Amino acid sequence: MISPKSLMKIATTASVVAMTVSVAVVPAYAMQDIAIEDTPSSFAATVDDVQNSSNSMPDNPNATLPETVSENISDDSTVVSENLAVTPEGDVQNIETGETVTDAQLVGTQSQQPDPLAKTNGESFIPVSASNVKDAVEQSVKQSVEQSSSKNGATVKLAKFDGNDYGAHWGTYNNTKAFFDYRNNLFAQQAKGVIDVSSWQGDIDWAKAKAGGVEGAIIRLGFGWGNDADAKAQRNINECKRLGIPFGIYWYSYAEDASGSRQEGNDVVSKLRQFGVSPNDLKYPVYYDLESWTWTGHTPPTNPNVYNGIVNAWYGALQSGGYQNLGVYSYTSYLQGPLNNANIYAKTRWVAQYGPQMEFTAFGTNDRGW
């Protein structure tokens, strides 16, 4: 999942998300990176308000393009951060040099899953094809003069749950806060401003976050199975409870099959109980974070039927543990590929996507997230 860089002052950065009261998640920035500053009524975005999209990664307006892409990076590789790409075989390469990356903190070991946020230093990033990145780099070179000029005019913008770079925006509908696409089509009404957080944000000042307009949180509990919980999960949960901030949970999957997802589900239940989180404590769902993961010696599934079994096994483990408020989280291209299954679509309640409008339209309920 996708969390932000740590810009620490009073609190640290967090991804801005908006949710409907019926529990839909709508990132105002498709995971907007922000810093919660001293002024409790504002969010200070860490992006340039005049950032030229020609210098940004495709589908990731806040991620900078590399200056070049190595000839060793194949077109069918997947770019997973500003400087890393993954081959179809699962090898991780440096985008600019083409060298294979073996750092266990980034790729894990045969028996140990890495922290998925380590590849991006905790920042938001939606995986994109290397072919698209190469095309974007070529275009960027042609516009390098204009881009350089644009960067000189950069400023920090203050906004309270801004819209995204493509025209999707906040507004009102039936006298409640709502989120719209660039054509003013309603995506979610009764929306709430929510942040997605993990240990990468350090010790968040939750009182200031609440005073600054944060209306809820999705807290990372952990990833894979057999790993420690997120180092700040207990603190974040306790603070949200103390201050009356509604919260949900997310868990990043490394499952290759239903056996792995069942272990992940059992791990989620165990840690929820360990941290004193009952089903009634969760105002937002427990999200199963399904992405194209990277783990040495292992490769993620590509068959939707396999993923369907993975999702059903995870759901079964959570439901057996008494947790019924569940949802799938992913991004558009993955949902249109390995997750292209009617049952998974029916369970999908949060989709990360940059752009002027939501391309995924198969939400099973009205509670949904962008």
Where are each of the predicted segments found?
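Substrate-binding cleft of extracellular glycoside hydrolase catalytic domains
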Residues: 179-313, 320-321
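Sec-dependent signal peptide cleavage junction
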Residues: 21-38, 44
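Non-catalytic propeptide/linker segments at domain boundaries
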Residues: 37-189
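Bacterial N-terminal signal peptides
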Residues: 14-22
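Surface-exposed substrate-engagement region within the catalytic domains
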Residues: 65, 73-76, 80, 87-88, ...
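Generic low-polarity alpha-helical segments
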Residues: 19, 27-30, 137, 241, ...
